[in-house]
């Protein structure tokens, strides 16, 4: 599972009980550690370990940056000091979780010790004034279910933001000429989102494969992995090319400091190596390096976002929307030539031939059924959005490649969304419900969430703890 560091910032206000604020600072920190959260506290910033003065901001910023914090939690241990919270949050520029523990029953004389909820109202307004996006977790008790769920969902949001803002994609050759749908604006991706491409020519990839094939130790290990993972249904003399390509892509990803890849797939690669890249893609996808087909840069970005939203617990499946189910009016075939990881398959994949080409190197396997999230990051004319929603695996006719028949609530509505854009026939599926996390992450990365079902109020209700 991916690791995220949370900067824990309890805050107080002078007119309410400092001892109670200190008490709830400790209780909250203990609860966060109990549920497995890696926190960086501010206990060494002042005697109370609380934020309430401007002088605390600089040392907190310095500490959190040195520790590599990925997001912060503004914990209103009592009312809190809203303007100092906002100044800190703006200076850090990280995702912000705003929360306070539910207040106790007033004292017999009517005295209230903390007024944490009231402080949340104030801080929410001031964060808006400072133009700081934030995530609100409902005012609840430390032992409430929504506390643990809300914290972990926020950590997943932080992971999406962190991944998205530190993405570099290995672009292996140009897009296929016939695939105008996968064109992207490299300069705009960098200017808007800090998403970088590392383009290399096909000749460099082919040479890297040749170099890999000369490495006997690496080849022996990869060939053993292939034989263990796949049922071999191609000529034996083609298997080393698959192994060499997988090794080469991993080395090039490392060389250029990338976290994903996009490959041209056809036709130049077949002229040089005599194989399709699908199985090699699947091998890298399995180890958490998404490699997508047809040089679909936006598809690679989608894959990174979807897996980050699940904290790396499951692998994504880069797919085509292909044909409607012959018997189910809301059924659709998700399929591609074979890049899906083995962990997604319901059976041992066959290393074989693809649907539309004569060269070996594809995989065939139906994916596991179950509940899914489907997503697609895309854009045109300077505007970007994230199509997302839910689906479930269903039975259907046998297929070629890696495939899964899915059912959505209203296929006609989804179909229109894809056609009218800015999306294309590619998406990424994952065996997890990460719709709320992706929806929330959009506010931090400057793209518009685009739900293909009318579930926005349900998503918001989930996020606020209902």
Enumerate the predicted regions with their spans.
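N-terminal beta-loop-helix "entrance" segment that forms/cooperates
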Residues: 37-66, 207-216
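N-terminal basic/disordered segments at the start of proteins
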Residues: 1-35
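Cap/lid and interdomain-hinge subdomains that line or gate substrate/regulatory clefts
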Residues: 2-6, 39-40, 100, 104-221, ...
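Long, internal scaffold/assembly segments composed of regular secondary structure
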Residues: 221-222, 228-309
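Extended hydrophobic packing segments that form well-structured cores
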Residues: 358-466
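Short Gly/Thr/Asp-enriched flexible loops that form oxyanion-binding sites at enzyme active sites
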Residues: 78-93, 270-282
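Short, well-structured alpha-helical segments in soluble
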Residues: 55-69, 88, 247-255
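C-terminal catalytic subdomain
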Residues: 133, 285-401
